[in-house]
Amino acid sequence: MQCYGQGKTRGTAAVLGIEATVNQACAALTVHSGCSKFLFYQLQNSYHAIRRLSNTGNQENLNAEIIKNFKILWPDELEQQKIAAILSTQDKVIELKEKLLAQKQQQKKYLMQQLLTGKKRLLGFDRKWNYVKANEIFKSIVDKNHDSKLEVLSSTQDKGIVPRSQVDIDIKYNENSLSTYKKVCEGDFVISLRSFQGGIEYSNYAGIVSPAYTVLRAIVKIDAGYYKQFFKSSNYIKRLNVAVYGIRDGKQISYDDFGQIKIPVPPIEEQREVAKILSTADHEIDLLQKSIEAEKQKKKALMQLLLTEKVSVKCNG
């Protein structure tokens, strides 16, 4: 077993399945009597407490002496094995669900590559797709006609445009400058400062966004769900990067850059059906992610109960 002692990952423990040597940043831990997997779970459960014991200085470090003197509960070996078995079973549940999630995500990626490009057509649809410049489908909206009481929205690569109150990080802004912010309506798309990395974001909310963003609104009839998926596809992001070669963090993709890229315009009925399929895939992925998070919380609860003697494990024999 090893415990990493430096930097942001200090305090991280791992059980080695092979014979190995470790560098000076790691402490090698050998269990002379007892269950090594139980020790691993104890260290995992004590992660934050161990980190707080780090040396101070230019770089906070752990050393062998600190780890050696760290006190943990150490029941008899049979109980250790029982507890380790329970937690290992929970780990396997999480691992299996994470593998299923990876498969679902790969399936979604494949569907996007096939359905959003017309490589694979749905039954009942055979009309040729049109390809037109994006500025024939979307226009840039600069609407600052608001009273600044609308909610401030932020761009995220995983959730699209959301209220700033839902973003984990604390983003500062000057309330006196809100009059310069652009109005966004539900169903609009937004080009953010990170769109060259994560595509163009869709807004399910009405609000206002930074003047650094470009707000896009359809000027012809479309299914927003189709373009919500299309603008996040790896194929489109690659094309966007080619069109704006040289742009780096902090620089905006202009509407003119966006508008010159040709995008597909399938029949509206086909747009809807493709969007439904991909939305269903998203829903399945979301449910599985929530299930995995619930299993991780269950494991944390088990560790708190079993590794602190709040609940004892019955041992026969």
Residue positions per predicted region:
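Non-catalytic DNA-recognition/assembly elements of restriction-modification systems
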Residues: 69, 77, 122-145
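A short beta-sheet element
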Residues: 1-44, 180-236, 254
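Short, solvent-exposed loop/turn positions at domain surfaces
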Residues: 88, 172-178, 247, 279
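Short amphipathic coiled-coil heptad-repeat segments
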Residues: 89-92, 96-132, 290-317
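Hydrophobic structural patches
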Residues: 83-94, 122, 274-285
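A short glycine-rich beta-alpha junction/loop motif
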Residues: 20-27, 43, 55-78, 194, ...
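Sequence-specific dsDNA recognition surfaces
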Residues: 17, 21-22, 28, 135-186
